[in-house]
From Swiss-Prot:
Coiled coil: none annotated. Disulfide bonds: none annotated. It is an enzyme of class 2 (transferase). It comes from Staphylococcus aureus (strain MRSA252). This is Probable nicotinate-nucleotide adenylyltransferase. The lineage of its organism: Bacteria, Bacillati, Bacillota, Bacilli, Bacillales.
Length: 189
């Protein structure tokens, strides 16, 4: 049975902390396939500084190239509108029937799971992999995996704010992503 990891997020922009999460999960679980799953529009997040989705996909591909593993699953992007993880996973599972699916979330999302659409069914379809984004460690429900990662306080919001104020984002994002953001004039407003 194939082991497939899905790492969802807005990735607006993708940054060094996302890379650390991806790397730690990849090396811990050693999946057959690893997908970054950018959302078109998350139901539980505010949508400020929304940029053309192609920019986000380009920056994710730059990170994949740097990490040396991963692919992009753009199902939610193609669908457009508000994205419910349940719908995405259900469709993905139909395409990958003989696979074991792992879905990566941070502690911020773990603490909101009861708000997720069809969460009980979703828990039957995937094994949640919870990474400690806000805490030094995380206790999780039975049937879930907790992965301890080095704590790095970087957020996409912080990066967008720094760019809009003309501050450096060096090492907060890979050099290729930094150059892309500057070259395209993203988040400068």
């Amino acid at each position: 049975m194939k082991r497939i990891v899905l790492y969802g997020g807005q990735f607006n922009p993708i940054h060094t902390a996302h890379m650390i999460v991806a790397s730690e999960v990849f090396h811990e679980l050693q999946p057959d396939e690893f997908y970054f799953l950018p959302s078109f529009m998350s139901p539980l997040k505010k949508h400020h500084d929304f940029i053309d989705v192609q920019h986000r996909l380009t920056m994710i591909q730059m990170v994949i190239d740097e990490l040396g593993f991963g692919d992009i699953c753009d199902d939610e992007i193609k669908r457009g509108g508000q994205s419910y993880t349940y719908d995405t996973i259900k469709a993905f599972k139909e395409q990958h029937k003989d696979s074991e699916l792992y879905f990566v979330i941070g502690t911020d999302q773990y603490n909101q799971l009861e708000k997720w659409y069809q969460i009980e069914y979703l828990k039957e379809m995937v094994t949640f992999v919870v990474v400690n984004r806000d805490k030094n460690s995380q206790n999780v429900e039975n049937g879930m995996i907790a992965i301890q990662i080095p704590r790095v306080d970087i957020s996409s919001t912080m990066i967008r704010q720094r760019v809009s104020k003309g501050k450096s984002i060096q090492v907060l994002v890979p050099k290729s992503v930094e150059n892309y953001i500057k070259g395209e004039g993203l988040y400068e407003h």
